[in-house]
Amino acid sequence: MKRGKKYQESVKLVDKTKLYDPVEAMELVQKTAKAKFDETVEAHIRLGVDSRHADQQVRGAVVLPHGTGKKVRVLVFAKGEKATEAEKAGADYVGAEELVSKIQNENWFEFDVVVATPDMMGVVGRLGKVLGPKGLMPNPKAGTVTMDVAKAIADIKAGKIEYRLDKTNIIHCPIGKVSFGTEKLVDNFRTLMSAIIKAKPAAAKGQYLKSVVVTSTMGPGIKVNPLRVSE
């Protein structure tokens, strides 16, 4: 794939042989973001685990101190008092079977996160084949299957993100916008990395953090020293 002139200019700013510390990396990710929109900054973390084994899964959620810069639309599956609680807490969509039908029949996906009360999981389970591949299925580990829907919504709106391994043992997560500046991006990055390090499975052997790369939406990858991610 041929890259544009701006991308080629950005690539020249990055030393491909160097492992940057987090502060240097965040400064560089801003310099290499040349798009006319406020690019998202992403972290890509390759782990020394095997996601094919159940005891080597890495999955969880963390509240980024400065959020992601993105307005997150929350759908809540709940009934009765819990539905009212969700509406008061600022959920964008609240419902039960009628929302399942809407998703199934209209291919409707105008939401970013799904929360459900435990009693609704039998209903939500019917959407497993469509929500699962999109990473939208509610999950207790991520705090999205809960009776405390108000807290779940507040955390998500405040910048809570879910992290999980893909099939190639890499975690991909947004950590903010280029406009955040170095300090906020570093704060968010360190918070994410601390959560991933704490989530290390007991069955994982050898080096846990294989590689860490940060990039803006349209920018080149910048390698971060795995030994310095908490600094």
Curated annotation (Swiss-Prot):
Signal peptide: none annotated. GO terms for cellular component: large ribosomal subunit. The keyword tRNA-binding applies. CDD domains: Ribosomal_L1. PROSITE patterns: RIBOSOMAL_L1. InterPro entries: Ribosom_uL1_bac-type (IPR005878), Ribosomal_uL1 (IPR002143), Ribosomal_uL1-like (IPR023674), Ribosomal_uL1/biogenesis (IPR028364), Ribosomal_uL1_3-a/b-sand (IPR016095), Ribosomal_uL1_CS (IPR023673). Keywords: Repressor, Ribonucleoprotein, Ribosomal protein, RNA-binding, rRNA-binding, Translation regulation, tRNA-binding. GO terms for biological process: regulation of translation; translation. It comes from the Bacteria. One of its GO terms (molecular function) is rRNA binding. PANTHER family: 54S RIBOSOMAL PROTEIN L1, MITOCHONDRIAL, LARGE RIBOSOMAL SUBUNIT PROTEIN UL1M. Binds directly to 23S rRNA. The L1 stalk is quite mobile in the ribosome, and is involved in E site tRNA release. Protein L1 is also a translational repressor protein, it controls the translation of the L11 operon by binding to its mRNA. Part of the 50S ribosomal subunit. NCBIfam families: rplA_bact (TIGR01169). Belongs to the universal ribosomal protein uL1 family. This is Large ribosomal subunit protein uL1. It comes from Acetivibrio thermocellus (strain ATCC 27405 / DSM 1237 / JCM 9322 / NBRC 103400 / NCIMB 10682 / NRRL B-4536 / VPI 7372) (Clostridium thermocellum).
